[in-house]
Amino acid sequence: MNVAVILFGGKGERFSKDYPKQFVKFHGKTLMEHTVEKFLENFIHLIIIVVNGEYLEESKKILKKYKRKNIYVILGGKTREFSTLNAVKYLKDLISEDDNVIIHDGARPFVSKEVILRNIDFVNKYGAVVTAVPVENTIAFVENKIVKEIPPRRYLFTLQTPQTFKYSILYKSFRLIKDLEKFTDDSSVVLAAGYNVHVVYGEKTNIKITTKEDLYLIGVEKIEGNI
């Protein structure tokens, strides 16, 4: 079984202080709809939507248009990783240890079917995978505004989502690691738990929408909403 966990747990205040970005419309649909629809595929058997409690009812209103019975909306946690933890706990009695859990940022509405399928293919081989693209710019370690080190670019990747894991690996990792607040993505939790995480090549177009400018940069001419 392939399970998609889509995270909308944050408030998106860098996008707008008054209007959560998942409800902003472009091309006739909300960001939430654009992202969720990328996972309405026959090879996705269950979808868990994780949302901030403030926006639970509004999210349910948007999602009720999808008649599939295998879409569940649950509450997120105080940080991204606690939102993932809530999903991991919710899934405990719904899926088996060998099922695949595909975790995706709700703010990445341009993920392609090909990237999702590559995640599924690789997780069946390796158990834990992360979508990533090679960095194109030189990266420096900086401390007190002084460059300390410039690592070779060939070793550096920008991590994206989906990040996909066998449920047994995800469950054991989130049980083992207690200081979740220091982690910013799921692959780092699994890595800290001692598992190897393999790379799935992503796409530059799979950007995370953080500010209004991100939408304008990819050619969205009109954004609807009280922003």
UniProtKB/Swiss-Prot annotation:
Residue(s) at site: Positions MEP for the nucleophilic attack: 153, 208
UniProt-listed Enzyme Commission number(s): 2.7.7.60
SUPFAM superfamilies according to UniProt: Nucleotide-diphospho-sugar transferases
Pathway: Isoprenoid biosynthesis; isopentenyl diphosphate biosynthesis via DXP pathway; isopentenyl diphosphate from 1-deoxy-D-xylulose 5-phosphate: step 2/6
Site positions (Transition state stabilizer): 14, 21
Family: Belongs to the IspD/TarI cytidylyltransferase family. IspD subfamily.
Name this protein carries in UniProt: 2-C-methyl-D-erythritol 4-phosphate cytidylyltransferase
Gene designation: ispD
